[in-house]
Amino acid sequence: MPEALDASPYDALLLLSFGGPEGPDDVVPFLENVTRGRGIPRERLKEVGQHYFLFGGISPINDQNRALLDALRKDFAEHGLNLPVYWGNRNWAPYLTDTLREMAADGRRRILVLATSAYASYSGCRQYRENLAGALATLEAEGLEVPRVDKLRHYFNHPGFVEPMTEGVLRSLAELPEDVRPGAHIAFTTHSIPTAAADTSGPVEEHGDGGAYVKQHLDVARLIADAVREETGIDHPWQLVYQSRSGAPHIPWLEPDICDHLQELHGAGVPAVVMAPIGFVSDHMEVLYDLDTEAKAKAEELGLPVRRSATVGADARFAAAVRELVVERAAVESGQKVTPCALGALGPSHQLCPVGCCPARAPKPAAAGADSPYA
């Protein structure tokens, strides 16, 4: 039996994710949840939902999260970490509020949260914290005992996140035709967000103008590119590019878009491309449609050989990283001195989101941070 690891004061881990439809009848109601409050007509949502209908109305994110749950539980058991793992979503079943209600009924009083977003941004961090605050307020209104909730730090530069992606890029390069492989370009991709949101991501005192979102992605891209060079002896050119833009066209978002980037690379005579979706934990719809369908169609139109590397998903190294992050945060809460594990130039992220981190346009209460009403 492995020596028991101590997660106290925590008594549960919550995997918190975006959610997605599980069949055609779920697509429009799911999109109504995603766009709630924006007044988007149902007919327009049916048009937007075509991405999901192409895949039978099923988002891959749910099975990806189920696989991650299994990987986490397996890793915890193998390493003597007695910590139950639950799952809740922002936009679809199992809904976050229902899961927290279940956890409260099970007697869970100190909960750690793993969000399926590795980087600092409003949509990837603070919005989840707002969701947590809203769910806890519901429990409070129902007269239930409200658990204390903390969130694991950003893990974008943890070895257990970076190394599987590096391996995926190397594998994709090896899959390219041998005659074009040496000149291949690596396009590191992530979700585009409004430039205003990017500029205010993370604590301003840490990241200044430009925010944490882009800087964190660039740090990961450099780590992977450097590791690829060490392994192959080839200094492949690379760039951070964006995908999955939405919203009003007059609002500036991060650019260039991956399809525009492929067009530019083709015009410059680049012989092949590896698309590396470093901004995503798993192969969900933005990866399967925007890269595997749309971007690959663009590359085929251009006659440009392209491969898409794998996301981390349920890789055992990522599950191990989560275990390490849990033990690390538990030690911090117990007053122990810890040395957080992190690669790259930026170092480990903060354990507790400070006041004013990743602000929203309309401020809302947010749990699991220095400004939490549920400390």
UniProtKB/Swiss-Prot annotation:
Protein name per its UniProtKB record: Coproporphyrin III ferrochelatase
Main location: cytoplasm
Transmembrane segments: none
Residues that bind Fe(2+): H191, E286
Residues of the signal peptide: none
Principal EC category: lyase
CDD domains given in the database record: Ferrochelatase_C, Ferrochelatase_N
Role: Involved in coproporphyrin-dependent heme b biosynthesis. Catalyzes the insertion of ferrous iron into coproporphyrin III to form Fe-coproporphyrin III.
GO CC entries: cytoplasm
InterPro entries cross-referenced by the UniProt entry: Ferrochelatase, Ferrochelatase_C, Ferrochelatase_N
Subcellular location: Cytoplasm
Catalytic reactions of this protein: Fe-coproporphyrin III + 2 H(+) = coproporphyrin III + Fe(2+)
UniProt-listed Gene3D superfamilies: 3.40.50.1400
Keyword Lyase belongs to the record: yes
